[in-house]
Swiss-Prot record:
One of its GO terms (molecular function) is RNA binding. Residues 1-21 are annotated as: Disordered. The gene is rsmA. S-adenosyl-L-methionine binds at residues 29, 31, 56, 77, 102, 122. GO terms for cellular component: cytosol. Its EC number is 2.1.1.182. This is Ribosomal RNA small subunit methyltransferase A.
Length: 288
């Protein structure tokens, strides 16, 4: 595999990165393998006129080949030094809208006027899961997402019931999105090389989920409780929330372990909790 510092197509176009040291507090690992970069951009398949948003462009390894195909790109970067470099980049600055911000604090619905957002990035591993759940709040405005993540996280996102990787993020993300791992990325593709394998995943929010649920916040809260102690049964983990006989009425074995329940199972329990809490609130209001 040939290596460079984020692409040398423009003969000096990426020189702007020189001298930047990866910052641990931002979880920075910079992609620098041309072959892997091309595979990732092919998977994204950016086209002119699309509402493309890159999170954490870093040294522009994905930014350059993406904007070559799309002509324009929004980038969200928290690191002030990298923002300045991108704003003064001799080849990219005119094609970029650079937003200095923490992606976790951004309301992505503000970009919806320009069409469904296509979001991608080599995410810092320390914010990857919170950021995905943050973006799912704006799923109606997002066409798809392509993220570089730890392979372990991608395995969890795509895991099926019964596997050791299956957990709360599997349920939360699969309820909202089609999940497809698309590119495997070795540590050698980064500077500095991380200690873990990486993978790029494609997340496509459903227009209509095959796993409908009335309250996603309720579902996420339920999964947090259910998977808190994986070795215990659902009866045990949810005893403060759902009576065992109610689980049976929903077609769920109370003696099952949390990782054996399907996404639909969790959605049914969540909907019962939503209805149950509404009923209790109505009864409380009537008694006042």
């Amino acid at each position: 595999m040939s290596k460079n510092q984020g692409g040398n197509k423009h003969q000096g176009g990426s020189k702007t990165h020189l001298g930047h040291r990866a910052r641990k507090r931002f979880g920075q690992n910079f992609l620098n393998d041309d072959y892997i970069i091309e595979q990732i951009v092919d998977a994204i398949n950016p086209l002119p006129g699309e509402n493309l948003i890159e999170i954490g462009p870093g040294l522009a390894a994905l930014t350059e080949p993406t904007v070559d195909r799309s002509g324009h790109l929004k980038v969200i970067e928290i690191d002030r030094d990298l923002v300045e470099r991108l704003q003064h980049h001799p080849f990219l600055s005119s094609k970029l809208e650079v937003i200095q911000a923490d992606a976790l604090s951004i309301d992505f619905s503000q970009f919806a006027e320009e069409g469904p957002a296509r979001v991608f990035g080599n995410l810092p591993y320390n914010i990857s899961t919170p950021l995905i759940f943050h973006l799912l709040k704006f799923a109606d405005d997002v066409k798809d997402m392509h993220f570089m993540l730890q392979k372990e996280v991608v395995d969890r996102l795509a895991a099926e019931p019964g596997s050791k990787s299956y957990g709360r993020i599997s349920v939360g993300v699969q309820q909202a999105c089609k999940v497809t791992p698309v590119v495997a990325v070795p540590p050698s593709a980064f500077t500095p090389p991380p200690k873990v394998e990486s993978s790029v995943v494609r997340l496509e929010p459903y227009a209509e989920s095959p796993h409908p649920v009335k309250d996603k916040a309720q579902l996420h809260s339920l999964c947090l409780t259910a998977f808190n102690q994986r070795r215990k049964t659902i009866r045990n983990n949810l005893k403060q929330l759902v009576p065992a006989e109610q689980m049976e009425a929903l077609g769920i074995d109370p003696g099952a372990r949390p990782e054996t329940l399907s996404v639909d199972d969790y959605c049914r329990i969540s909907d019962w909790l939503t209805e149950h809490s509404l009923t209790k609130q109505a009864e409380k209001n009537d008694s006042q």
